């Protein structure tokens, strides 16, 4: 399973591609790995378009009765200063709910916009979702610029993108916008060109530089108690069960005791191995890792549970929360709701139905309102105060909340 050890001598940053379907997110992902692998052949592998796309597709087709897995592809690459783990988020509207957990893994996002098409509905929705799930830094890649007959078109699209960023609370005027063509960069590398001097690769170097300079070094919560939300579960013959996910805080290494918390009764086990990109690591906050668990069957664990230091987090189902209900113009509900409303609550990698009850004299909560609500979930999940969650209904986000008090 392991192929060497990851030497963490560069700052580690999680990023991902967002944007409308067919604007070139997957092509750009492949282009970045192509350019980076040409510059750092010892440590970075080029990932072909088909490999990125296939990973997204294969992970996306799951039993419809289960919580839908994030249809994403994970790749890694380097700049001169940083090591990046990159997730290629799906752009299709059917998969948009997965961005709630997909984008939550990002320290920053690369918004891909086709210079031919300009801003499209999913461009806006992904920017909105990024804001909601706490992605505070976006770098824009204006793709397919080689196909423009009129260079002024790029100016128009750029202005449009800045407006969208400003509208959703990002600073459009300060956001780096890089123009280029992902496919041209791939072709240049395939033709054996030097990425540091070839004009078609310049846009990718500019993009890496923008990621390095615009997205600040992440503040990791390494010193807190270990917690990782389980994204996926695999069985490895002869080795046991592996759970994967992003470490939210603390660190984990071979031999540590852990608890599996939420959805089912809490189980205690020992982590017998930690890996990232097929290399053995000490997992620290921010890393996407796989943890091998001793004596745990594949069917005894599921996505949405958390792996944590024993005794540090407990399962709960009833809590008070401060929520903001999105206005219609923000993509939310057109009408209000009353007590008994049953939407989906998204906590980390869990989506679970909850019954909302209004507090005090409130008769109805309207779009645009801030309110303190009592929520009871149908299943207990690992929860703590100050934890953020999204409220979803009919395939769209209708509100955001933060747990203010755990009741039971």
UniProtKB/Swiss-Prot annotation:
Mg(2+) binds at residue 26. GO terms for molecular function: GTP binding; GTPase activity; translation elongation factor activity. Pfam families: GTP_EFTU, GTP_EFTU_D2, GTP_EFTU_D3. Its main location: cytoplasm. GTP binds at residues 19-26, 88-92, 143-146. It is an enzyme of class 3 (hydrolase). It is found in: Cytoplasm. It catalyses: GTP + H2O = GDP + phosphate + H(+). Keywords: Cytoplasm, Elongation factor, GTP-binding, Hydrolase, Magnesium, Metal-binding, Nucleotide-binding, Protein biosynthesis. Residues 10-219 form the tr-type G domain. The keyword Cytoplasm applies. SUPFAM superfamilies: EF-Tu/eEF-1alpha/eIF2-gamma C-terminal domain, P-loop containing nucleoside triphosphate hydrolases, Translation proteins. One of its GO terms (cellular component) is cytoplasm. Its EC number is 3.6.5.3. NCBIfam families: EF-Tu, PRK00049.1, PRK12735.1, PRK12736.1, small_GTP. Monomer. GTP hydrolase that promotes the GTP-dependent binding of aminoacyl-tRNA to the A-site of ribosomes during protein biosynthesis. Belongs to the TRAFAC class translation factor GTPase superfamily. Classic translation factor GTPase family. EF-Tu/EF-1A subfamily. This is Elongation factor Tu. It comes from Brachyspira hyodysenteriae (strain ATCC 49526 / WA1).
């Amino acid at each position: 399973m392991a192929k060497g050890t990851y030497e963490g001598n560069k700052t580690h940053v999680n990023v991902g591609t967002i944007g409308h379907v067919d604007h070139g997110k997957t092509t750009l992902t492949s282009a970045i790995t192509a350019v980076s692998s040409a510059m750092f052949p010892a440590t970075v592998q080029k990932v072909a378009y088909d490999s990125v796309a296939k990973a997204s597709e294969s992970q996306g087709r799951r039993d419809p009765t289960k919580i839908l897995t994030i249809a994403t592809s994970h790749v890694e690459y380097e700049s001169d200063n940083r090591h990046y783990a990159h997730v290629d988020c799906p752009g299709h509207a059917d998969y948009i709910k997965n961005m709630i957990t997909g984008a939550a893994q990002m320290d920053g996002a690369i918004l891909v916009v086709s210079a031919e098409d300009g801003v499209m509905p999913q461009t806006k929705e992904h920017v909105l979702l990024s804001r909601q799930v706490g992605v505070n830094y976006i770098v824009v890649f204006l793709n397919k610029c080689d196909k423009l007959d009129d260079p002024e078109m790029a100016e128009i699209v750029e202005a449009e993108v800045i407006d969208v960023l400003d509208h959703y609370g990002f600073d459009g005027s300060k956001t780096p916008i890089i123009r280029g063509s992902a496919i041209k960069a791939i072709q240049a590398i395939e033709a054996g060109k030097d990425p540091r001097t070839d004009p078609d690769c310049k846009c990718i170097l500019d993009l890496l530089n923008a990621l390095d300079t615009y997205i600040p070094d992440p503040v990791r919560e390494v010193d807190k108690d270990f917690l990782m939300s389980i994204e996926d579960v695999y069985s490895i013959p002869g080795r046991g069960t592996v759970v994967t996910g992003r470490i939210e805080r603390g660190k984990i290494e071979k031999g540590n005791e852990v608890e599996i918390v939420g959805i089912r009764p809490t189980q205690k086990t020992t982590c017998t191995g930690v890996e990232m990109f097929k290399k053995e690591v000490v997992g620290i906050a921010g890393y996407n890792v796989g943890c091998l668990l001793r004596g745990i069957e594949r069917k005894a664990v599921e996505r949405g549970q958390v792996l944590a230091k024993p005794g540090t987090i407990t399962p709960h189902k009833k809590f008070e929360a401060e929520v903001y209900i999105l206005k219609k113009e923000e993509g939310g509900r057109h009408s209000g709701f009353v007590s008994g409303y049953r939407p989906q609550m998204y906590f980390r990698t869990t989506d679970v139905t909850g019954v909302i009850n209004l507090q005090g004299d409130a008769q109805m909560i309207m779009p645009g309102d801030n309110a303190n609500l009592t929520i009871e979930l149908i299943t207990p999940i690992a929860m703590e105060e100050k934890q953020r969650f999204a409220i979803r209904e009919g395939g769209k986000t209708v509100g955001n909340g933060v747990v203010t008090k755990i009741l039971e």
